[in-house]
Regions:
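Catalytic cores of the polymerase beta-like nucleotidyltransferase superfamily
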Residues: 1-452
Length: 452
């Protein structure tokens, strides 16, 4: 055990003894401990949890963050650093066993007294045989009423199955199917939070969600696609989007299958800022884009996603369609550096995500990718080898030069000139200030084409 963490635990244990109140580590802390996974979130429960939290936060000189101040259900958090925080929750019921009976799944319904944990005694309190389910890699609900008490648990079952790589026990899956519509009672921001965690897993359990029919409740458009067929094969309209989702998931796991020169760079990109999850979300709602009246931004706002996340999904969908359109010909498209540069400039932060989604669409639709692969690699190579390094160097020309030397004022042409000069610099057409000024003077009187 980390010496710093042990010191924290000793202090908390001492406070609980002073208050004559037993304190336990519970839930995900015990699950991760038994799985030998790194623990960043320590969950405590005690009848005196609020007072222990207040006194300990004061002792370690950290802010006490209230997560829930409902009388009898108080939860407080103390953040020690970005990778370590302690949560203190009031014991539910008179005993730890009563508390555990109110938790969601057997693997989360275990506890150990803090003194035993400190002394590394494996005296696990496990009334629902969670240790057996951990060993057998099974998600099992503690009691059926768990889904009625908090319908978000319907989705959490799949989140844990996805993040841990576990199966959902048959009866639990059946109960989810029975209670599936109750997910509509849950605030959309809570649903979005769980969906992001689920989709952020390397293998999101879409097939299990389909079996329970929860997927169709969360995304009603999928239910419509499942009932519509494509003649003459009779295949449902959902089969294509589902294949695209699976191909995207596979591509994110193994980009070296087709994009070997850039595989490690891509893995680094998708690991940041929820890109992994948001890309999969893009694939899930892509079928809706076929409806000309569909407003992706408004649709995503219903989930209370951040504006940044909404823009990422919207622009990924938009620019992936451009990639598919531009590479539709036998030649593959994007052959000229100028074309590549302009697409990179327009797509911005969503360049890579749009390329990956477009690739998944081609794979999912079982289209010929012989010419598509070189096109995507050509764009990635230009972006990584030329465009990104060029962004680290200052522009040859700025607005001050246009104002001072050419007597221009900020206007659409002003922006047009700066963009064209920057394009020429990145493409290697010009290298010096003199060349930049010469090009600017030519652009002042040339026809103007504003970029999007």
């Amino acid at each position: 055990m980390d010496p710093t963490v042990k010191k924290y635990l000793d202090d908390i244990n001492h406070l609980s003894q002073q208050l004559e109140s037993s304190i336990y580590l519970v839930g995900g802390t015990i699950r991760d401990h038994l799985l030998e996974r790194p623990c960043t979130d320590y969950d405590f429960t005690s009848s005196q949890a609020p007072e222990i939290a207040r006194q300990w936060a004061h002792k370690v000189q950290r802010t006490l963050v209230p997560l829930d101040e409902t009388p009898g259900h108080e939860t407080y958090r103390v953040v020690l650093n970005p990778n370590l925080y302690f949560d203190f929750t009031t014991l539910q019921g008179q005993t730890i066993e009563e508390d555990l009976a109110q938790r969601d799944f057997t693997i989360n319904a275990m506890a150990i007294s803090l003194p035993d944990f400190i002394e590394e005694k494996e005296n696990i309190i496990d009334p629902f045989d969670g240790q057996d389910d951990l060993r057998n890699q099974i998600i099992r609900v503690t009691l059926e009423r768990a889904f009625e008490e908090d319908p978000l648990r319907l989705l959490r079952a799949f989140r844990f199955a996805s993040t841990l790589g576990f199966d959902i026990e048959t009866q639990t899956l059946a109960q989810i199917k029975i209670h599936k519509t109750k997910i509509k009672q849950v605030a959309q921001e809570r649903v979005a939070y769980e969906l992001l965690l689920l989709l952020g897993a390397s293998r999101s359990q879409l097939d299990l969600m389909e079996q329970s029919e929860l997927l169709e409740v969360l995304f009603p458009s999928i239910a419509e696609l499942k009932t519509a067929t494509r003649p003459p094969s009779g295949a449902t309209l959902w089969e294509g989007p589902r294949n695209i989702f699976e191909e995207l998931q596979s591509l994110l796991l193994q980009p070296d299958r087709f994009l070997e020169p850039h595989a490690q760079w891509i893995k680094g990109y998708i690991s940041k800022n929820n890109h992994y999850a948001l890309l999969k979300w893009s694939a899930l709602i892509r079928p809706l884009m076929a409806n000309p009246t569909f407003d992706a931004t408004e649709y995503l706002r219903k989930f209370r996603l951040s504006n940044t996340a909404i823009q990422f999904i919207y622009r990924t969908l938009k620019f992936s369609e451009i990639v598919l359109s531009e590479t539709h010909s036998t030649g593959g498209g994007f052959k000229e550096d100028t074309t590549v540069y302009r697409f990179i400039h327009r797509s911005g932060n969503e360049l890579v995500s749009s390329l990956l989604l477009a690739f998944a669409v081609r794979l999912g639709n079982q289209e010929d990718i012989k010419y598509f692969i070189p096109s995507i690699n050509r764009i990635l190579n230009f972006y990584i080898e030329k465009y990104l390094p060029a962004q680290k160097s200052p522009a040859l020309l700025d607005g001050n030069v246009l104002i001072r030397k050419f007597k221009l004022t900020p206007s659409p042409r002003f922006r047009f000139i700066l963009e064209k000069v920057e394009e020429a610099r990145v493409l290697g057409i010009i290298e010096t200030l003199e060349e930049a000024e010469k090009l600017a003077s030519e652009l002042i009187t040339s026809p103007m084409e504003l970029s999007e």
